[in-house]
């Protein structure tokens, strides 16, 4: 897990020059290709698609380069179950969010813009957190690292630090 922090932070910052070596170190330490793909895919929910896509391209380039050098990196596992759809996805995402936060999430912002709450529940906590080839502790560690590099994300950083504390103490 220690290699997830620099990879996540550098990818969120868009620091490709330093991301390559961090990815190399992670692979050398046994982090699987699919674990890194999960972290860098999850990145888009926090830092946007451009940074996620650029980081994934950097990983792909590195894996191909290493393959050319005869290094066979562990691909790791894929998700073991299909992601729910429709109402089942909303239900799963809401349950995941509630478990991570420690209580149901609501409030004035979600009353004002209910679509954002639905997107969080169905997509972030549904589609992404239902993928079981990266554990929740690693996902939250990655999220905290990502948010810590982003200006103006203090409220979200605090929220995810609280979620991490709940995960690591339960």
Q: Where are the language model's segments positioned?
A:
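A structural feature that tracks compact, well-ordered secondary-structure segments
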Residues: 10, 22-25, 132-133, 143-163
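The feature marks the first
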Residues: 1-25, 32, 45
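Structural motif
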Residues: 1-2, 30-36, 132-138
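N-terminal alpha-helical segment
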Residues: 19, 36, 121, 138-141, ...
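Short, structured motif recognition centered on aromatic/hydrophobic residues
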Residues: 2-10, 39-40, 139-148
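Secretory/endomembrane lumenal or extracellular ectodomains immediately following the signal peptide
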Residues: 1, 15-17, 48, 52-134
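Conserved small/polar residues in nucleotide/adenosyl-binding loops
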Residues: 168-169
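Hydrophobic/aromatic-rich structural module bridging two neighboring secondary-structure elements via a short loop
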Residues: 22-60
């Amino acid at each position: 897990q220690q290699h997830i922090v620099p990879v996540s932070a550098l990818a969120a910052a868009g620091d490709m020059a330093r991301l390559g070596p961090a990815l190399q170190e992670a692979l050398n330490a046994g982090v699987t290709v699919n674990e890194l793909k999960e972290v860098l895919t999850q990145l888009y929910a926090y830092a946007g698609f451009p940074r996620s896509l650029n980081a994934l391209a950097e990983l792909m380039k590195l894996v191909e380069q290493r393959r050319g050098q005869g290094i066979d990196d562990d691909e790791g596992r894929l998700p073991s179950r299909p992601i729910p759809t429709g109402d089942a996805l909303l239900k799963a995402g809401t349950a995941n969010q509630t478990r991570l936060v420690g209580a149901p999430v609501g409030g004035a912002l979600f009353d004002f813009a209910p679509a954002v709450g639905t997107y969080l529940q169905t997509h972030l906590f549904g589609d992404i957190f239902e993928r079981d080839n990266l554990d929740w502790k690693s996902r939250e560690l990655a999220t905290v690292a990502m948010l810590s590099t982003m200006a103006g994300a203090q409220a979200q950083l605090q929220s995810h630090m609280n979620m991490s504390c709940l995960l690591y103490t339960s």
